[in-house]
Amino acid sequence: MDPVGLQLGNKNLWSCLVRLLTKDPEWLNAKMKFFLPNTDLDSRNETLDPEQRVILQLNKLHVQGSDTWQSFIHCVCMQLEVPLDLEVLLLSTFGYDDGFTSQLGAEGKSQPESQLHHGLKRPHQSCGSSPRRKQCKKQQLELAKKYLQLLRTSAQQRYRSQIPGSGQPHAFHQVYVPPILRRATASLDTPEGAIMGDVKVEDGADVSISDLFNTRVNKGPRVTVLLGKAGMGKTTLAHRLCQKWAEGHLNCFQALFLFEFRQLNLITRFLTPSELLFDLYLSPESDHDTVFQYLEKNADQVLLIFDGLDEALQPMGPDGPGPVLTLFSHLCNGTLLPGCRVMATSRPGKLPACLPAEAAMVHMLGFDGPRVEEYVNHFFSAQPSREGALVELQTNGRLRSLCAVPALCQVACLCLHHLLPDHAPGQSVALLPNMTQLYMQMVLALSPPGHLPTSSLLDLGEVALRGLETGKVIFYAKDIAPPLIAFGATHSLLTSFCVCTGPGHQQTGYAFTHLSLQEFLAALHLMASPKVNKDTLTQYVTLHSRWVQRTKARLGLSDHLPTFLAGLASCTCRPFLSHLAQGNEDCVGAKQAAVVQVLKKLATRKLTGPKVVELCHCVDETQEPELASLTAQSLPYQLPFHNFPLTCTDLATLTNILEHREAPIHLDFDGCPLEPHCPEALVGCGQIENLSFKSRKCGDAFAEALSRSLPTMGRLQMLGLAGSKITARGISHLVKALPLCPQLKEVSFRDNQLSDQVVLNIVEVLPHLPRLRKLDLSSNSICVSTLLCLARVAVTCPTVRMLQAREADLIFLLSPPTETTAELQRAPDLQESDGQRKGAQSRSLTLRLQKCQLQVHDAEALIALLQEGPHLEEVDLSGNQLEDEGCRLMAEAASQLHIARKLDLSNNGLSVAGVHCVLRAVSACWTLAELHISLQHKTVIFMFAQEPEEQKGPQERAAFLDSLMLQMPSELPLSSRRMRLTHCGLQEKHLEQLCKALGGSCHLGHLHLDFSGNALGDEGAARLAQLLPGLGALQSLNLSENGLSLDAVLGLVRCFSTLQWLFRLDISFESQHILLRGDKTSRDMWATGSLPDFPAAAKFLGFRQRCIPRSLCLSECPLEPPSLTRLCATLKDCPGPLELQLSCEFLSDQSLETLLDCLPQLPQLSLLQLSQTGLSPKSPFLLANTLSLCPRVKKVDLRSLHHATLHFRSNEEEEGVCCGRFTGCSLSQEHVESLCWLLSKCKDLSQVDLSANLLGDSGLRCLLECLPQVPISGLLDLSHNSISQESALYLLETLPSCPRVREASVNLGSEQSFRIHFSREDQAGKTLRLSECSFRPEHVSRLATGLSKSLQLTELTLTQCCLGQKQLAILLSLVGRPAGLFSLRVQEPWADRARVLSLLEVCAQASGSVTEISISETQQQLCVQLEFPRQEENPEAVALRLAHCDLGAHHSLLVGQLMETCARLQQLSLSQVNLCEDDDASSLLLQSLLLSLSELKTFRLTSSCVSTEGLAHLASGLGHCHHLEELDLSNNQFDEEGTKALMRALEGKWMLKRLDLSHLLLNSSTLALLTHRLSQMTCLQSLRLNRNSIGDVGCCHLSEALRAATSLEELDLSHNQIGDAGVQHLATILPGLPELRKIDLSGNSISSAGGVQLAESLVLCRRLEELMLGCNALGDPTALGLAQELPQHLRVLHLPFSHLGPGGALSLAQALDGSPHLEEISLAENNLAGGVLRFCMELPLLRQIDLVSCKIDNQTAKLLTSSFTSCPALEVILLSWNLLGDEAAAELAQVLPQMGRLKRVDLEKNQITALGAWLLAEGLAQGSSIQVIRLWNNPIPCDMAQHLKSQEPRLDFAFFDNQPQAPWGT
């Protein structure tokens, strides 16, 4: 027994343990490596006896402390076959703290370190603690070599039998397959590169381990960063490098050191390089300084590897980086150990800024298919299950995609190794569907068969979760209970290593074998532990963004935790979790449901690309189809992925989710590092419609993988592969794959640096892609010869419609033929031939070869090529090197190339000499519409028009029309040709040659010339004026910016005499804008046949042309008297009519006088306009004087002293009235007399407008005094002149002195109007309207005085003048006149609140006799008519009548006053009053009043509220009014009793002439009363009973009652139900009514039978003037009957909606033709289709014609509109809701100028287009008096309608009728 055994106190137990372990020395060695990672198991121990070696190893374990010893004992009991009695003794003795003696613990701790870590860690002192010893060079070299050998030996010992992962199965240790490595093309020289690792990675160039380091001195970067996602094998590769170096493969390095940041993070102090190497790795046996000096001197042969750079702790405060990161930074930058090589491994993320910009970046991309197969072969080498494993991987696509991650591939192999012997082939699909179940099966595989240690798993999971939450990945023995350490070691869940934080500070650390395993165990704990509730659980289900640089500085440790939680939420995992949860299946189910619910919420949110990928992983792990479907459907149509790495597993997961989606999706991968085999994951994804990749990482291998996937994507329409490194090899794969994708519509290979031949290879597939619309080959530099080859492809390929090449751009646009699916499936050769045949028939090609360095010989080749090709839409060769010859060749070829739209030769070096050649070359080109050449701007553009035979189809013409109208009037129709030679430096010497070259163009169409921006000067302008007649009829000539003087400009005015085509000359002198134009409508829009040929439109435009005046517009020009004199002298010979428009900054009085003096010399002048011209205050008087001096002036309009217009009569017009407008001219009182004196010299002034001046009250007073001298016969407008009530009262006082004033109106409110209307003769009666005058009480007496003196004033209206009831009563009492009638109308807000009683009380105060009273509460109006002098009533008679009134004292007094005042009352009107609100007191008073009104002739009570009792009172009063001639009770709703009372009141009313009972409900009893009373009314002239519910029986009785009414003139029975029977009775009596003038039977259900009888009767009504029979089914028979003999005095005929046809309507029209009295006709809503409604003879009085909704078409409208000229009085034409088109509009536009009284035309809901509307606008412009033409709901685009309305406001396109005011002066 050794001493230790003796001290244990149980020698027998120790011996048993030694004997047990001696049987399995390999197991003990493995445990020694686990618990003592740096233990040296060298050959020196092999000489010992096996039992002694075991004792030595146990001693080493024992001295580590109780935790290690207890963990070891637990491992012994778990893993070895220990007898039960021995296991109990071992656990009871050593398995707990009390079994470990403190003495031995102390003894173990006191042993020297060399015994603890023999062979690896030698005791040493720090580098700085020993004095420097002098050694010779040889000794230094020996020491260094000894250390280097020690370093290599220690590495050999470490990797002798395994790679990292101690305790794992043997198979794990032997398998190593290098992953795919790709080197980045650029280093970290940008912040983006530092963040992500540069995404521009070479594809297809794998990097081997030996290639990672460039050993050439001073060549390449010294720092290498290895980037790879979790599980890619970064740590494994780092240890592999150490192993390779230990085996002598990396001879370029003498020393290699490997550090892990997870351990370095534990260092809290700053380290020197020697401390890093010797204290934390391996210390020399002696003389550390000498060894370090050697390493420093040979640093270029030293390799430092840092694993887990992403785990480096970033600085948290302002103190800078941590100690280890600082040291790492200095090593990378070369400030420490300069020249050494540094390699760091990291996950993609935000890397520290300390990395140098030139650091080499290498990406680890995991396994591709061959590597997975190789790994499986190695793993299962020499095992019978190898083939089975390969089969499983081949059949299980999901498992195969998971194996792209090397760590998962290792786990998958372990699971297959466990599953294959016990399961049938193909079970992996069910057992290993995702990553979570891989780990679950791994746990089951590592567990003892049939036994799952649930508590240990959950406890270890709790440790894992605690580590994730605290950021801890290294655990010590104190952190994990010994049984858990033993459990982790036994099941290969934990790995151990030596943690050295300084000299002498070393201890064993534990970590989970992989971070993902730690996350999986944490997820197990969360899902199965009873300590965790579901609310806590859901907090861990989050999505982590991979854009780490934007969110956090360090990658999280729980990135996969949500994925594992989602995977454990799968139903498949429930039995496993329930077992872990001790059978608590309900709790597990609730947690699973909670996880799924969180994922459902996340699925419906808008997520970034990285989170979408994370979500897809989580959803895919759940294996829930419903959740997958929800996620797939919630993904956006455009799904972008930008600037974050994606693996093949990511894309495979995305594909799995998309399988649950129905709608197509667009995937865009921009800047995402992708593995070369990534596209394989998209195989069979039928939901992808657009697929786009943009990454330098994509190369040939990527393209090859993509070519295999593309044919399987059935919906793919767009493929983009931009910015890649694809070569010819990769493109060849894609070219072979593209024809297998016939559904592709767009393909992009932008920015791929493709060669010429590769580009040509690509375009070869164009005929094989029948639906392709776009091919983008931009940013792939090609030569000119290749470009011409591509042009040939564009010409020959039948589907290409555009080739666009400009510098880097190269794009094909195609128009695939419309083909069915069956056609697409036919043989390719048949498709190609069909396509060529169709293309030859209809294709047009656009060719844009801009800035392509084309020369003259290239142009020749291109012309030859294009002549063989299809029609060309556009050819753009701008920016090349064609020069004069090349441009000439292209211009000559233009007519042969059939270019439809544009030829652009800009920026091709054209000279002035070349301009002439080009002009001659295009002279014979019939289709040229415009040529624009500007040598200064290097512009040469040819615009072409379609040939006439190519313009087919009405739809094309309509589309052309709309486009034309949108351009009017500034743009040109296709029939014109415009030649623009601008900024070409042309001088006078060039003109003759130019005009010769232009001669051929002048005869091809209407020519527009533009010579602006040249250098013609005065000589050139004069010479051009001589040459212009030789050029024929131009449409316009632009001479702007040619340096002309004022003399030359005025000289151009002579062209009016020499050029017949010149209609308008616009000159802006200062800006040198000079434009000569013809008539804009004489461009002959129908010349080419491109527009419909309307004879009416052509005739109308011809008429317009004859009437259009010539116009000279001269602006920005100094208008001095000499210039004006010369100008007028030049204009003498100008043919007329002439409009002269002048504009300058200021026009002096002398210049204005000169201009006005010259007016008599210009008899052809029709308009003189001074716009935007400053005029002096004297100008109003100068202009006013012209009204008398120049008889041709008919209107002067001066506004604001800046705008003046003079309108002149033509020579044919007779002298007539004139008008003057002087608004906003600052006229005040001092100017009034002078102005009135000048106006008094006029013969006849129809209107004078002095509004918006400064007259004030004093100026107005002065003006009113001068009024008698001014011969005004129309309107005087003085609005907006700052007047007050004083002026209103003065106007009243001056009315007696103004005999010709007929009406005056004053509004002092916001309207501020003051208008006086005159007549030519003295007016007997005058009307004055005063509104919002705010009269005060003191004004009432003055108002009354004025009214009393103005005896000719017969009517006064006071609207809202602040007169209360009291003031109104005073006014009525004060007004007194000698004799005559006077009406006062008051409208005040209080009138609607005042009762009838109070209003009658006001009337009682009148001084004259009240003859009429009218009260309307809702209109707030009281009207009183007074008669003077007042006739006093006999007091005794009044007292007698009062005695019979049952009224109170106050009411009796009021009745008495009324009886006196209203004794002569003849009319009492009450409208919309309420007689119920005062307990019938008003009706009682009215009863009393009616009893006294012996002269009352008219009583009206309409639309009012009266109680039954009140009606009885009124009926009683009315019963005594025996002289009543008119009774109106319409629009009331009385009950039957009240109605009967009123009917009884009609008894004895034999003098009644007019009776209106409309809307009263007349039942049989009330109607019987009425008919009985009617039979007594022999004087009745008008009876209105509309809407009284009268039937045929009632009509029969009514007819009998009317037999005696021989004086009846009007009968209105409309909208009853009399029917044919009632009409029959009525027809029998109508001939007996000889005075009948108006009958209205509309809406009475009369059919054609009744209508015929009625027509026969009406023929006998000789005096009939108005006949209204609408809304009855009369039909043509009735119309024919009426037409046989219409009454000769007929004025109004209304037959709307009468079921008339063309025959009936035409018969009526013929009967009405030439009717001298007809004023209105309505045939609306009848069918006139095919009928021609025409009037041949004049209808002199016809004012309105209504033909709404009569199905009138263009043909019918032609004759109808021609008839309108026979109706000189026509004011309203209603043609809405018909079928009128542009032809009808043209006809109407032709007659509009001839209709002087027409005010309104309704053309709503027709078929008029923009052309028709424009023609109507042109018709309005001819001086029509029309106020509005309504065009709502015609097929006119909104923008076009707005444009037309801006040009002509009287065109109304709105739904509501917004009629503008008529133009002033009409």
UniProtKB/Swiss-Prot annotation:
Induction description: By IFNG/IFN-gamma.
- Outline the extent of the NACHT domain: 222-539
Quick one: where is this thing mainly located? cytoplasm
Q: DNA repair as a keyword?
A: no
Q: Which InterPro entries match?
A: Leu-rich_rpt, Leu-rich_rpt_Cys-con_subtyp, LRR_dom_sf, NACHT_NTPase, NLRC5_atypical_Card, NLRP_HD2, P-loop_NTPase
Q: Quaternary arrangement and interactors, per the entry?
A: Interacts with CHUK and IKBKB; prevents CHUK and IKBKB phosphorylation and inhibits their kinase activity. Interacts with RIGI and IFIH1; blocks the interaction of MAVS to RIGI.
Q: What is this protein called?
A: Protein NLRC5
Origin organism is Homo sapiens
